[in-house]
């Protein structure tokens, strides 16, 4: 009998240092018990010329350290995701006009989505990694971009689109992890948590005693 709907569980709830509903959904789907504790003013700004993968690692580490400092002996997971075109980081749009401007720049081009993830272990160790996905968009007409912006979906998305939602119609192809584009490199994170014994597989009783 499963005690959750996902394939994994943990002895103690993981602290997810993120308010992202997409990241919460991944944890729920995997069955990993967690609680959300948000870092306060911990996200740094990009440094001019900083590579996307360097920035997301630095940002994820800052978030994880901020939460772990007040929760010693707990496992903390933090992540940060950015979209970058020609090595220029595109954050969340400041307005509808800003969202449309970003989408115009991305249309017909290949850009990079970089996610950094930092795991602070209960004993105090820390592991940080990043994942890179290349996303190619088709040359979508202006009126379709404007119609997409009008849905409101781009407002809280890095790069002004959500591949898991309405914005899927903008994407011609991807090279790399799909979950990374959504906001969390799930395969890499699961492998790390299993390797460190932070989570374990939730097997039916008959499988355990077979």
Swiss-Prot record:
CDD domains: Maf. Its EC number is 3.6.1.9. Its main location: cytoplasm. One of its GO terms (biological process) is nucleotide metabolic process. Coiled coil: none annotated. PANTHER family: BIFUNCTIONAL DTTP/UTP PYROPHOSPHATASE/METHYLTRANSFERASE PROTEIN-RELATED, BIFUNCTIONAL DTTP_UTP PYROPHOSPHATASE_METHYLTRANSFERASE PROTEIN-RELATED. This is dTTP/UTP pyrophosphatase.
